[in-house]
Amino acid sequence: MENLVEKLKKAKESTYILSLLNTNEKNEALRAIANNIEKNIDKIIKENEKDIKRGEEKGLSKAILDRILLNEKRLKDIVKSIEDVIKLPDPVGEIVSMQKRPNGILVGQMRVPIGVIAIIYEARPNVTVDATILALKSGNAIVLRGSSDALNSNIILTNIMKEALSNTKIPQDAVQIIESPEHSVVEELLQMTDYIDVAIPRGSAKFIKHVMNISKVPVIETGAGNNHIYVEEDADFEMARKIIINAKVQRPSVCNAIEKLLVHKNIAEEFLPVIVKDLREYNVEIRGCEKTLKIVKDAIPATEEDWYTEYLDYIIAIKVVDSIDEAIAHINKYNTKHSEAIITKDYHKALKFLRMVDAAAVYVNASTRFTDGGEFGLGAEIGISTQKLHARGPMGLKELTTTKYVIFGEGQIRE
């Protein structure tokens, strides 16, 4: 197996070539990748089936197997997301601001690539493509280290992308994959400050915290999704039912699904039996606080641990609250700062929720399932940042750049 340092050196060297490419040259390379993926769908599915079979033998949950799965529809969606990124404006080289100083010099900021991005992710082979496409379009090299549960899928996708780059201006070395399943390789990777400019972990909260604790490389935290919907006493019941079902059961294994439901006490007796019936039609397990248990008598008592847990499964915990203030306090205590929603007709309550809830994305009368790069018009995302510095929310092209000061003069010297 190729030495880790050699791979990182090649990635670093490729960034100098990437920095000189224009938008058309980068888009042509992305188009070649999209075409090669589309041409090799059957081959990708065959390799993905190996991962699924091995996962079933290991006893992986349905939720994790769903994350690993690549079928024709999902692969065509990946191709479409590449086409969407091609259409997006290239942020590299954009002058963010320019001002003339009293001495005549022009001082501005220019968007430039970050450099080498390492993405460390669990069982989501689509991330292999999404991360690569966004990195290359924004002028960055990418180092991919996916989960061993999706290793065959990740390798075939990487090989197909590198093959596509062979006849383009983007060097193949700009895409590197770390195939070793050993955890020690991740720890070694995260010490490589000479070669890696930023690391982006994607996975469980425990996994992300582990990466942040051991890394010397700067890390952008992409949080787990312990997301809530709060139903205010004035909410439209039909709207609330539709949003809750979509946010919980459409794809429970993703980070923008909801895990908790908060309901105002004044509507709990009327609303809870209805929404619980809806949820149980999809075999969702109901857990609840003491007040919930008085209304939904066969619900499972929720523990303190439940309020912190991202289930990624057909499970939901319900809490009855006395007020919007209690709802906000509960959310800010237990959430992962990902996506939160309120269902209400009251503009002032909606505004209060928007201002006071600490999350990367806060919704009024809409499903949290929209927290996604494609849905936000970013084409795709390399991750959803839940921290407050550099980037917050879905990270697209702009978030994979930084700025440098550029200064134009006509011979000025400092007096």
From Swiss-Prot:
Q: Does the keyword Translocase apply?
A: no
Q: Which domain of life is it from?
A: Bacteria
Q: In which pathway does it act?
A: Amino-acid biosynthesis; L-proline biosynthesis; L-glutamate 5-semialdehyde from L-glutamate: step 2/2
Keywords linked to the UniProt accession: Amino-acid biosynthesis, Cytoplasm, NADP, Oxidoreductase, Proline biosynthesis
Q: What enzyme category does the UniProt record give? A: oxidoreductase
Q: Which GO terms describe its molecular function?
A: glutamate-5-semialdehyde dehydrogenase activity; NADP binding
Q: Which Cys-Cys disulfides exist here?
A: none
The UniProt entry's GO CC annotations, sorted and at most eight, read: cytoplasm
Q: Please give the SUPFAM superfamilies that the UniProt record associates with this protein.
A: ALDH-like
UniProt xrefs under HAMAP family: ProA
Family, per entry:
Belongs to the gamma-glutamyl phosphate reductase family.
**What is this protein for, i.e. what is its function?**
Catalyzes the NADPH-dependent reduction of L-glutamate 5-phosphate into L-glutamate 5-semialdehyde and phosphate. The product spontaneously undergoes cyclization to form 1-pyrroline-5-carboxylate.
What is the protein's name according to its record? Gamma-glutamyl phosphate reductase
Q: Which organism is it from?
A: Dictyoglomus thermophilum (strain ATCC 35947 / DSM 3960 / H-6-12)
* Gene that this polypeptide is encoded by: proA
